[in-house]
Regions:
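N- and C-terminal low-complexity/disordered segments
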Residues: 1-114
Length: 114
């Protein structure tokens, strides 16, 4: 693999939108995060990049046919778009059941406004 390909595969550049009261409500908060080099508007960027680097598939959806507890975690919603390790990402997060709360909690460090 050449150097350019390695850089593209390692690159992370994310746009994060958080709706503390649900996506149909205002206000919303927006942040950016880049990890190669570390930058953006997200607080604690270096720590966020380090935590992301340890996660296998932080933006994967809940698998189909999984039983989830019916626990409501709150109205918060978030959208993450951009590139993670060179792969395009478009992931929505909410706290409407146990599975979604678990997904949210894995990357909650990306959602400081919630």
């Amino acid at each position: 693999m050449n150097v350019l390909a390695a850089i593209l595969l390692a690159s992370t550049s994310l746009h994060i939108t958080v709706w503390p009261n649900g996506s149909d409500q205002t206000p919303k908060k927006t942040y950016t995060l880049t990890c190669t080099p570390v930058g953006g508007t997200l607080p604690f960027r270096a720590g966020a990049c380090a935590r992301l680097s340890r996660l296998k598939a932080p933006f994967a959806p809940t698998p189909k046919n999984v039983a989830c507890t019916e626990i409501y975690g709150g109205p918060e919603e978030a959208l993450v778009t951009g590139r993670f390790r060179g792969t395009l990402v478009r992931a929505r997060f909410n706290r409407r059941d146990g599975c979604e709360i678990d997904r949210w909690n894995r990357v909650a460090f990306l959602f400081p406004a919630a």
